Amino acid sequence: MPGVANSGPSTSSRETANPCSRKKVHFGSIHDAVRAGDVKQLSEIVCLHWLLWHGADITHVTTRGWTASHIAAIRGQDACVQALIMNGANLTAQDDRGCTPLHLAATHGHSFTLQIMLRSGVDPSVTDKREWRPVHYAAFHGRLGCLQLLVKWGCSIEDVDYNGNLPVHLAAMEGHLHCFKFLVSRMSSATQVLKAFNDNGENVLDLAQRFFKQNILQFIQGAEYEGKDLEDQETLAFPGHVAAFKGDLGMLKKLVEDGVININERADNGSTPMHKAAGQGHIECLQWLIKMGADSNITNKAGERPSDVAKRFAHLAAVKLLEELQKYDIDDENEIDENDVKYFIRHGVEGSTDAKDDLCLSDLDKTDARRPSKNCRASWSMNDYVEKN
């Protein structure tokens, strides 16, 4: 139990020569029970639950100030975390650096453990002694899954630490490109990334240069952020892309239906409105674009289709929608039904001047459509008569 000097398993718990005659392992503290690890071990040797049932002190701390919850968060022991929460463990307890179990789960990339703690109602924006929040730790250590989860749970990515660093500064400093891209996409404006300086007067470009993070530098230079107000420029040149990016379906409909933009219009980087909507996970915009016949197989300059962009930003519903559409397109191209008139409408030659609607006209419509042709023949006969006389 807590407070026992020798916290390791007792010598009497060692296995004998006969593998069938094993003795139970007795742990000196709840910390050793959590260190034991996976769920099978926990159930087989009756450790954590046994200690909890017998009144083990879940507030006991190590020399670093770690409680059992801290160790479970570090090791990603989901079952341990659940058991500790059910027994009233304090998830706001701070260690010597001011870190809570939430900070440590984000540091070590245990997103499922992190989600269990978030569901218990713990504050996701708690700070340590350096004013780092869990999002700062996730960005600094390149834990994209944890970072996305924390943002989904409402954590702000515009909170600064004691040095004025945003999470995007920390991602740039450590060269975590995927986290950097995700944070850039979630900032309130594209230019805010370069305009944000920490207390040392450094922005993301300065930090990437100082720590020789070439991948971050190449991304910034390739995207041409420096010295340009991309938001204003894009709003003027590609209003449809901006509407799709913001999820403004009403504006997008108006622009397309009024003929202001083409539904597959491509921006300077080769992206279409569907790319923009997919990158932000705007399902309603995507559904409307698909209904209007937007091409989901167009790639941008990075070689990404809309489904690839949705994958990059972890919008799973958008990925599913677009991949099902692409699967349908592939099957549709392989199966030709000569008796299906609508097949030829869907697969009409691009730029053809033929009226594809004529294929589905009723008999009355076809009769009406031939009337102008009769008038033309009558006028030709009259012209011939005039020329002869």
Curated annotation (Swiss-Prot):
Residues 7-19 have a biased composition (Polar residues). It comes from the Eukaryota. SMART domains: ANK. One of its GO terms (molecular function) is NF-kappaB binding. Disulfide bonds: none annotated. It holds the Pfam family Ank_2. Keywords: ANK repeat, Repeat. The keyword Repeat applies. Residues 1-21 are annotated as: Disordered. One of its GO terms (cellular component) is nucleus. ANK repeats lie at residues 25-60, 64-93, 97-126, 130-159, 163-192, 200-232, 235-265, 269-298, 302-332. This is Ankyrin repeat domain-containing protein 42. It comes from Homo sapiens. The lineage of its organism: Eukaryota, Metazoa, Chordata, Craniata, Vertebrata.
